[in-house]
A protein has these predicted regions:
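Proteins with a high burden of low-complexity, intrinsically disordered sequence enriched in S/T/G/P/A and R
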Residues: 1-2, 200
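Beta-rich, aromatic/charged-enriched effector core domains that present basic-aromatic interfaces
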Residues: 3-148
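Catalytic cores of enzymes that engage adenine nucleotides and/or redox cofactors via long glycine-rich
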Residues: 104-200
Length: 200
């Protein structure tokens, strides 16, 4: 419990009367941290995580409001209305439809040019971390031999810009397309860096 011990020392040394922290999205660490707070009887406040457009409470209330089958489409509609995303002044979807899924299933033309994902420039920053991963997590699945995604905010934002500049215009048409020799096609592949909070 090295982290907890050090954190508690800082709290006592700085005479901190209350700690405030964002919701912890790693469930294992959240449980561990909550236990640390409870055992040490720390005055604390949990703040909604800015990585998400909705709070946990809001999503929980949505789930409780669903009497039968839970449909994520209903949740997306609710959030679009709340945040006025592609919504007209009558609180209806722009274009008259909530979903255009049928337009996402076009067949990928044989001669279409597929933009490559941007090469990663920050591999040097990853080298020391790679050594630690290989040392402490050597028996875990996966490999550190090839780093294909950004690990810092600067490159993550460049990655996002690249998606809008080179892929976004074709993303909708070929969202569900598959090609065996290409893993990403017109997808942004930003889910991992979104989940790490590098774009938030």
């Amino acid at each position: 419990d090295i982290f907890e011990d050090k954190f508690l020392k800082v709290i006592k040394k700085e005479d901190i009367s209350k700690i405030k922290y964002f919701e912890i999205e790693d469930h294992f660490f959240e449980k561990r941290f909550n236990n640390f707070v409870l055992v040490n009887k720390l005055n604390h406040e949990t703040i909604n995580n800015p990585m998400f457009l909705t709070s946990r409470l809001e999503f929980k209330e949505f789930l409780q409001s669903q009497k039968k089958l839970i449909r994520m489409a209903s949740f997306y509609q609710k959030i679009r209305q709340k945040l006025s995303i592609l919504i007209d002044d009558q609180n209806k979807p722009l274009g008259g439809k909530w979903s255009y899924d049928e337009d996402n299933r076009k067949k990928l033309p044989k001669n279409i040019d597929i933009p490559k994902i941007p090469p990663i420039q920050n591999d040097n920053k990853f080298k020391s971390l790679k050594l630690k991963i290989n040392s402490f997590f050597y028996d875990h699945p996966g490999s550190t031999d090839y780093l294909w995604m950004p690990t810092d905010r600067e490159e993550s934002l460049m990655w996002l810009d690249n998606f809008f500049e080179n892929k976004f215009s074709n993303f909708g048409n070929y969202e569900d397309a598959i090609r065996s020799e290409n893993n990403f096609l017109f997808h942004s592949a930003i889910s991992p860096i979104l989940n790490m909070g590098l774009i938030t």
